[in-house]
Amino acid sequence: MEKIVLLLAIVSLVKSDQICIGYHANNSTVQVDTIMEKNVTVTHAQDILEKTHNGKLCDLDGVKPLILRDCSVAGWLLGNPMCDEFINVPEWSYIVEKASPANDLCYPGDFNDYEELKHLLSRINHFEKIQIIPKSSWPNHEASLGVSSACPYLGKSSFFRNVVWLIKKNSAYPTIKRSYNNTNQEDLLVLWGIHHPNDAAEQIKLYQNPNTYISVGTSTLNQRLVPKIATRSKVNGQSGRMEFFWTILKPNDAINFESNGNFIAPEYAYKIVKKGDSAIMKSELEYGNCNTKCQTPMGAINSSMPFHNIHPLTIGECPKYVKSNRLVLATGLRNTPQRERRRKKRGLFGAIAGFIEGGWQGMVDGWYGYHHSNEQGSGYAADKESTQKAIDGVTNKVNSIIDKMNTQFEAVGREFNNLERRIENLNKKMEDGFLDVWTYNAELLVLMENERTLDFHDSNVKNLYDKVRLQLRDNAKELGNGCFEFYHKCDDECMESVKNGTYDYPQYSEEARLNREEISGVKLESMGTYQILSIYSTVASSLALAIMVAGLSLWMCSNGSLQCRI
């Protein structure tokens, strides 16, 4: 009885003072994925995938876009009468064209190398329209009769504003020889065309000469065109067709024209006064009177995130497009509040998900810290040094990832003519392949970084635990749940010394040794008692078994079941 009382007294003494190492927990339900696990609940996380836009066309860095409304690029450059609002346009940040604009080539035909011209425009921010061959400078040809009902203006027949359709005059079409020398310091975009009549009668009616040609030459261009006379279906009321061409005339270079019919001469050209990043974006959106750094056909993106999944085509300083629906980067710890007692999977270091069973919602001023209890009370205290180092480390890592992924680029649609469909299909397959690879890389990066972040937190908790363990040594007992029981009295000053790393082991070692030996002695004495009882029990059992065997043998001998010889 005395031993039992002594044991209870010692147990109550040892249990009194404790210090535990733990980590922060909160009410967060946000989940992340790692290489090893899915749907890991964490205390803090950062979404790095932008999914929202404003649904508007905006200025890009303060520069308005050129929104062509119902006009196409061809209609704008040639001067479709329905596109007069774009006769002179200011600097633009990007060009917006509808998928099927109504005001294209009003007189039916083709625009040669149209896709290449659009690609050129993706590197231009401003044109200045200049007159190179005045309409009044054709005294031997009709320069005002070249109009068509296909290009109406105010209910009357008209024609493209920037070129002149030359017709015979007084039943004659003298051979044209005309040159223009580019004396500007800028490159010049020059446009001209040829008319393909419906039949020979129309050819004679308009140009008098049955066999005509157009020759165009520069230092880099040598072109000779002849009309293709053929019966065709009517488009916009016209059986004839027009084909338009363009070239870039360098400074101090000259363009020379020679023709005896079917010539659509340039009147205006475009001086390229500013080059820069631009794009031709297909979109049906309206202008939103807003400003952005990143524009997509779906709307503007204002985000510092490194990825987005809104549209693969962008202009400006944009996040990278990925096909993912979710990219969440862990910044905090595994969120396992103490009330949630079920065992979680272990992290690399086994700290948070291993020997420590749940976080503390009561510790709100740090990621890692302590909980102590002694005669003076109990309380939580964050380890601010390790917490700050962890915050700095995670913040630097997140910023580094964003910086690496934020290499700005533009992705604009490429257009191909009908003869290049196989190239277009190959290009789409290549772009889809690049997007698939980039999406995979982004998702893998997030999984790996989340694994590293959670292991980083596990390691920090384990390091804090080891810091305490190495200080206390045998002055305290490890309980296996992140806590230590002192073999000596540890007041608040003592607790504080453990937390800040100044614990004086020798000061408490003698008291701890005595208490430790006293507890060990009780255990040994109890062990001896148990051993004696075990021996007595074994001997008694053996004697009882021997007596039973002897009695059974005598009974069998007496009734003849067993022969007994002496």
Swiss-Prot record:
* Membrane spanning residue stretches: 532-552
| Modification note | Palmitoylated. In natural infection, inactive HA is matured into HA1 and HA2 outside the cell by one or more trypsin-like, arginine-specific endoprotease secreted by the bronchial epithelial cells. One identified protease that may be involved in this process is secreted in lungs by club cells.
Which residues, renumbered to this chain, are glycosylated?
Answer: 26-27, 39, 181, 302, 500
Q: Where in the cell is it found?
A: Virion membrane; Host apical cell membrane
One GO cellular component term of this record is: membrane
Q: What else is known?
A: Major glycoprotein, comprises over 80% of the envelope proteins present in virus particle. The extent of infection into host organism is determined by HA. Influenza viruses bud from the apical surface of polarized epithelial cells (e.g. bronchial epithelial cells) into lumen of lungs and are therefore usually pneumotropic. The reason is that HA is cleaved by tryptase clara which is restricted to lungs. However, HAs of H5 and H7 pantropic avian viruses subtypes can be cleaved by furin and subtilisin-type enzymes, allowing the virus to grow in other organs than lungs.
| Main localization category | virion
Task: Check the record and name the Pfam families matching this protein.
Answer: Hemagglutinin
Question: In what way does this protein cross or attach to the membrane?
Answer: Single-pass type I membrane protein
InterPro entries per the record? Capsid_hemagglutn, Hemagglutn_HA1_a/b_dom_sf, Hemagglutn_influenz_A, Hemagglutn_influenz_A/B
Q: Which cysteines are joined by disulfide bonds?
A: 20-483, 58-290, 71-83, 106-151, 294-318, 490-494
- Its source organism is Influenza A virus (strain A/Chicken/Hong Kong/96.1/2002 H5N1 genotype Y)
Cytoplasmic domain ranges by topology: 553-566
**Lipid anchor (S-palmitoyl cysteine) at which residues?**
557, 564
| Identification of the protein by name | Hemagglutinin
Endpoints of the signal sequence: 1-16
User: Which loops or segments lie on the Extracellular side of the membrane, by the record?
Assistant: 17-531
Does Aminoacyl-tRNA synthetase appear among the keywords?
no
What are the GO MF terms of this UniProt record?
Answer: host cell surface receptor binding
Which keywords belong to this entry?
Clathrin- and caveolin-independent endocytosis of virus by host, Clathrin-mediated endocytosis of virus by host, Disulfide bond, Fusion of virus membrane with host endosomal membrane, Fusion of virus membrane with host membrane, Glycoprotein, Hemagglutinin, Host cell membrane, Host membrane, Host-virus interaction, Lipoprotein, Membrane, Palmitate, Signal, Transmembrane, Transmembrane helix, Viral attachment to host cell, Viral envelope protein, Viral penetration into host cytoplasm, Virion, Virus endocytosis by host, Virus entry into host cell
**A biological-process GO annotation:** virion attachment to host cell
Q: Which family does it belong to?
A: Belongs to the influenza viruses hemagglutinin family.
Q: Which residues carry the site feature described as Cleavage?
A: 346-347
Q: Assembly state and interactors?
A: Homotrimer of disulfide-linked HA1-HA2.
Q: What does this protein do?
A: Binds to sialic acid-containing receptors on the cell surface, bringing about the attachment of the virus particle to the cell. This attachment induces virion internalization either through clathrin-dependent endocytosis or through clathrin- and caveolin-independent pathway. Plays a major role in the determination of host range restriction and virulence. Class I viral fusion protein. Responsible for penetration of the virus into the cell cytoplasm by mediating the fusion of the membrane of the endocytosed virus particle with the endosomal membrane.
